[in-house]
Curated annotation (Swiss-Prot):
It comes from the Viruses. It is found in: Virion. It comes from Acanthamoeba polyphaga mimivirus (APMV). This is Uncharacterized protein L352. Keywords: Virion. GO terms for cellular component: virion component.
């Protein structure tokens, strides 16, 4: 009987209607049971009734502040990480060679179907400021820049990491500054005279299963519990040198541009940090039976 007349039949009105095939294929068949039911018409005989199994593949993403382009991001505590950047191109403009590329730091991969991103670990510098002291050199008073060790970063009860793309995802707090942050970082242990390991509390963004995420960039910055930006405001991006120390004196030359010994160099190791993220990506695979 025609389906239009069956609509008035109480015994059949709730049955699934017959699908119309197109070139012998039902275009809606892929939506029945999501098309993932095992109908025993596959070559493999070790598959479960539900063919689809989703697992999470976890990736480590490591970011060093020293890898940033300090002409774009002079401060090591404020920069943007780009994922899967555009390819580098060169062109000639008014007789000058111009290179077009995303400024470092970049991660040459893209992350789609993301279930979570988590701050796994972080290494921070004790010191972010310098001070000037007077030194008597052969009867002349000369001002010298020194690391200001009287105001370590650990004077703060904790440090907050902000990620612009994931603000306020984890915390409900009486401190609005904390509520807008991605992670709270407490002092854990000293690893050198200049750096310490932070203990991460929270620091995770979880995407719902029906709305998995895509990570294109991470705009990172750091603040104190009072919302004050943590920065190294004395650094000078005008200083240009490669990552090689050619100083004759292990303590550094007096007027060196060396990145290791010039306290104004944006890549001076004393002021850098290291971040380790874990990103979980949902990966579909066949749901196979395991035989012992």
């Amino acid at each position: 009987m025609n389906n239009y007349f069956d609509a008035g039949n109480f015994n059949t009105v709730f049955n699934n209607p017959n699908q119309m095939s197109v070139h012998g294929y039902d275009p809606k068949s892929g939506f029945n049971n999501h098309g993932f039911m095992n109908r025993n018409n596959l070559l493999s005989n070790n598959l479960c009734n539900n063919l689809l199994d989703e697992e999470i593949t976890e990736y480590s993403v490591l970011i060093d502040s020293k890898d940033r382009n300090y002409q774009v991001y002079p401060d090591p505590f404020k920069y943007t990480v780009k994922f899967n950047p555009l390819r580098r191109t060169t062109e000639i403009i008014d007789g000058e060679k111009v290179v077009n590329e995303e400024p470092m730091p970049v991660i040459n991969d893209n992350f789609k179907n993301v279930k979570y991103i988590r701050l796994e670990s972080i290494i921070l510098p004790f010191y972010t400021k310098i001070r000037f002291v007077d030194e008597d050199i052969d009867g002349d008073i000369v001002q010298r820049a020194k690391v200001n060790t009287s105001k370590p970063l650990t004077d703060n009860l904790y440090v907050l990491m902000r990620i612009e793309e994931f603000k306020g995802v984890n915390y409900k707090s009486s401190n609005d500054v904390l509520a807008e942050s991605f992670a709270v970082i407490y002092f854990d242990n000293k690893i050198s005279n200049t750096h310490y390991e932070g203990k991460c509390n929270g620091g995770i963004k979880i995407f719902p299963s029906d709305k998995l995420g895509t990570i294109n960039s991470l705009k990172i910055s750091f603040v104190s519990p009072y919302g004050e930006e943590i920065n190294c405001d004395h650094l000078m991006k005008e200083i240009k040198s490669n990552m090689i120390c050619n100083c004759d004196d292990p303590e550094g030359d007096e007027y060196t541009d060396c990145f290791k010994h010039n306290l104004f160099h944006p890549l001076n190791p004393i002021f850098q940090h290291h971040v380790h993220f874990k990103i979980g990506v949902v990966t579909p695979r066949l749901n196979k039976l395991n035989f012992n």
